[in-house]
């Protein structure tokens, strides 16, 4: 919770096709972020790494972004069309991470 009258920023995170295995096998999370700061996907990825990424971070994060093979959809739109890491999150955004990396 933030310390002033600025509301928290509520967003929904979803994980699919194996990505959920890296996040405690939880497919959907509703999270509240500090509404006093600007939240981009870049900030969100850092927050996720520090707070909810529980298994093998190298399979999800590469440098400051997601690994190749992780699709990111924001409100059902490919993040590449929305500015990728620079996209500024808005209240009730739905961010879906889909793993296309499968062994065989």
Swiss-Prot record:
Q: Which UniProt keywords apply?
A: Cytoplasm, Isopeptide bond, tRNA processing, Ubl conjugation pathway
The entry's localization annotation reads: Cytoplasm
GO BP field: negative regulation of JNK cascade; protein urmylation; tRNA thio-modification; tRNA wobble uridine modification
GO cellular-component terms in the record?
A: cytosol
Q: InterPro entries attached here?
A: Beta-grasp_dom_sf, Mopterin_synth/thiamin_S_b, Urm1
Q: Please describe the post-translational modifications of this protein.
A: C-terminal thiocarboxylation occurs in 2 steps, it is first acyl-adenylated (-COAMP) via the hesA/moeB/thiF part of the MOCS3 homolog, then thiocarboxylated (-COSH) via the rhodanese domain of the MOCS3 homolog.
Query: Chief subcellular site?
Result: cytoplasm
Mark the residues carrying the PTM 1-thioglycine. 104
Keyword Cytoplasm among UniProt keywords = yes
Residues of crosslink Glycyl lysine isopeptide (Gly-Lys) (interchain with K-? in acceptor proteins)? 104
Gene3D superfamilies cross-referenced by the UniProt entry: 3.10.20.30
Pathway assignment reads: tRNA modification; 5-methoxycarbonylmethyl-2-thiouridine-tRNA biosynthesis
Similarity-based family? Belongs to the URM1 family.
What HAMAP family does the database record attribute to this sequence? Urm1
Q: What does this protein do?
A: Acts as a sulfur carrier required for 2-thiolation of mcm(5)S(2)U at tRNA wobble positions of cytosolic tRNA(Lys), tRNA(Glu) and tRNA(Gln). Serves as sulfur donor in tRNA 2-thiolation reaction by being thiocarboxylated (-COSH) at its C-terminus by MOCS3. The sulfur is then transferred to tRNA to form 2-thiolation of mcm(5)S(2)U. Also acts as a ubiquitin-like protein (UBL) that is covalently conjugated via an isopeptide bond to lysine residues of target proteins such as Prx2/Jafrac1, Ciao1, Eip71CD and GILT1.
The subunit field of the Swiss-Prot or TrEMBL record says: Interacts with cer.
The name this protein goes by in its record? Ubiquitin-related modifier 1 homolog
Source species: Drosophila mojavensis (Fruit fly)
């Amino acid at each position: 919770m933030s310390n002033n009258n600025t509301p928290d920023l509520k967003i929904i995170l979803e994980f699919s096709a194996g990505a959920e295995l890296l996040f405690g096998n939880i497919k959907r999370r509703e999270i509240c972020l500090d509404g006093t700061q600007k939240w981009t996907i870049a900030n969100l990825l850092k927050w996720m790494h520090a707070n909810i990424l529980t298994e093998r971070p190298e399979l999800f994060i590469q440098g400051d972004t997601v690994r190749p093979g992780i699709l990111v959809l924001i409100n059902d739109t490919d993040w590449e069309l929305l500015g990728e890491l620079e996209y500024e999150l808005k209240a009730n955004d739905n961010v879906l991470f889909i793993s296309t990396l499968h062994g065989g």
